[in-house]
A protein has these predicted regions:
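Pyridoxal 5′-phosphate
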Residues: 198
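Solvent-exposed beta-strand motifs enriched in subsets of small alpha/beta binding domains
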Residues: 27, 356-357
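Catalytic cores of secreted/periplasmic lytic hydrolases that degrade extracellular macromolecules
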Residues: 1-190, 201-322, 328-332, 346-350
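Acidic glycine-/aspartate-rich tracts in secreted/extracellular proteins
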Residues: 341-343
């Protein structure tokens, strides 16, 4: 499939070689392997410390995993850091790890590149156990345990004195995230995370001038084209009813690459945003809400199953003769919520079938 990204949001990717007589560069970025015109990128030697002063990396602190992102590899600083989940048993605290897919982690940059070029992950620290950021991959059909009061309380705690109807369009919006989730099957916590990320807690110029909390139609070439709404709650309605429920979670639409936030390999991020870390950034705010509300969390409440590369049929019954409800896209790392496991026709020696959402 074809995709798109914006170099402003991601300065570095893994160089995997040249193709098409040197006219194309093969690379990995945000989980996807792709080709780009050679004259649109610059190939630099990672070991040249005078030129390459920063690259994306992961580190564990205080029991959490953080992803630091650079927007200029010639400068020794990082523009943003996103929480991408809880520290795993195979990870050490305060140790730098490298990864351009967020699933397999490496202690050295060269080991990572060598594995990518060989199409293996055997030299990663978790070769047999890929990591998936829960909030980045849980289904958009999930329901949250958080309340409208929880959502409003977090926005208020973050904005402090700016939490009023004049300075933020996210003032008292919690009710609408919950109501529209229950009506249209759009996970309230994910929509909340996207709104926080896209509108800077409802304080961005597009949010304030157009009641648009999601950057709908704010294309890179002309953000001023962003949709205008009569109220901020109507932008939540539009997002949940059309963007999430229909266009990004319904297989018949070309924008469907999996009903979850995802990255550039799968999920809403493939077609929704040019920022390759858009899904991860929204998930960051979901984790932050988790930490703000004591004793409550959605993380891990659903078990997930993942599909590898290639299209598969989703069937009505646990037999290959059953009607196919739809055929998935070929995207790898496509996730589904597991609703249960049943016995059915034996396929490749197994009679286990998953009921999925």
């Amino acid at each position: 499939y074809s995709g798109y990204t914006n170099g402003y949001y991601a300065a570095d990717g893994a160089f995997l070689g040249y193709e098409n007589n040197g006219t194309k560069v093969k690379f990995m970025l945000a989980g996807v392997v792709g080709l780009v015109d050679a004259d649109e990128v610059e190939i630099l030697n990672y070991e040249d410390e005078d030129t390459v002063q920063s690259v994306n990396y992961y580190i564990c602190k205080n029991g959490n995993i953080y992803h630091s992102i650079t927007l200029n590899i010639r400068q020794p600083y990082y523009t943003s850091t996103a929480m991408v989940g809880k520290q795993q048993s195979y990870m050490k605290s305060n140790t730098v790890y490298y990864s351009y897919d967020g699933h397999y982690f490496y202690t050295t940059y060269q080991k990572m590149i060598d594995d990518y070029k060989a199409n293996t992950r055997k030299n990663s620290i978790n070769a047999s156990k890929p990591y998936y950021n829960y909030y980045q991959y849980v289904s958009s059909r999930t329901k949250t345990s958080f309340t409208a009061s929880d959502l409003n309380g977090y926005v208020k705690s973050y904005l402090d004195d700016l939490y009023n109807s004049k300075d933020t369009k996210m003032y008292n919006m919690g009710k609408y995230f919950i109501d529209y989730q229950n009506t249209y099957g759009a996970y309230a916590l994910a929509s909340f995370g996207v709104a926080v990320n896209e509108s800077a807690f409802g304080t961005s110029s597009i949010a304030l001038s157009k009641n648009n909390l999601f950057g709908h139609n704010a294309v890179d070439s002309d953000p001023g084209l962003a949709n205008g709404y009569s109220s901020p709650q109507n932008s939540i309605l539009d997002h949940d009813k059309y963007y999430v429920n229909l266009w990004y979670s319904t297989p018949k639409y070309s924008t469907y690459h999996g009903a979850f936030l995802g990255d550039k390999a799968s999920g809403m991020n493939v077609s929704y945003a040019s920022d390759p870390y858009w899904g991860e950034s929204a998930a960051h705010w979901m984790w932050q809400l988790d930490e703000y509300v004591s004793g409550k969390s959605d993380a891990g409440s659903k078990k997930l199953v993942f599909k590898d590369q290639g299209a598969i049929n989703i069937r009505k019954e646990a037999t290959t003769s059953s009607a196919s409800l739809y055929t998935t896209p070929k995207n790898g790392n496509m996730s589904f919520n597991i609703l249960g496991k049943v016995k059915g026709e034996s396929v490749s020696g197994s009679t286990d079938w998953y009921k999925i959402q």
